[in-house]
Design a protein with these regions (language model features):
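Polybasic, low-complexity intrinsically disordered tails and interdomain linkers
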Residues: 1-34, 71, 92-101
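Signal for well-folded cores of large energy- and translation-related assemblies
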Residues: 11-14, 31, 54, 58, ...
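Compact, glycine-rich, soluble single-domain proteins
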Residues: 43-49, 54-55
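Short basic, glycine-rich beta-strand/loop surfaces that mediate nucleic-acid
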Residues: 55-101
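Alpha-helical elements of the RecA-like P-loop NTPase motor core of helicases
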Residues: 28, 51, 75
Length: 101
């Protein structure tokens, strides 16, 4: 899946569904089994903050997508600063985009 489509899904889910912002919130959503899609930023430093997300997603059978920057992800998530990760909890109108993945 492309990073652009993942960011589009985050924006749609933010306005019509529900998302969790931040690496800790995304981790909790995955562990609780409520995450539909996890999107994380490649430029997070230190990388250990998000390094576990792809492995945890694979273990829990959750789709996971990397995007280039935390600033782009923050904008898509509706926050004024960058965010390391976002988990989509309720996809809302982004349901069709998630099906593509």
């Amino acid at each position: 899946m492309s990073a652009e489509r993942a960011l589009e899904a985050v924006e749609l889910a933010r306005t019509t569904g529900k998302i969790k912002k931040g690496a800790n919130e995304a981790t909790k959503a995955i562990e609780r089994g409520v995450a539909k899609l996890v999107v994380y930023a490649k430029d997070v430093h230190p990388a250990e903050i998000v390094m576990h997300l792809p492995l945890l997603c694979k273990e829990k059978a959750v789709k996971c997508v990397e995007v280039p920057t935390k600033e782009e992800l923050g904008i898509a998530a509706g926050v004024r600063v960058g965010t390391a990760a976002v988990a989509i909890i309720n996809e809302g109108e982004a349901k069709n985009i998630l099906k593509e993945l």
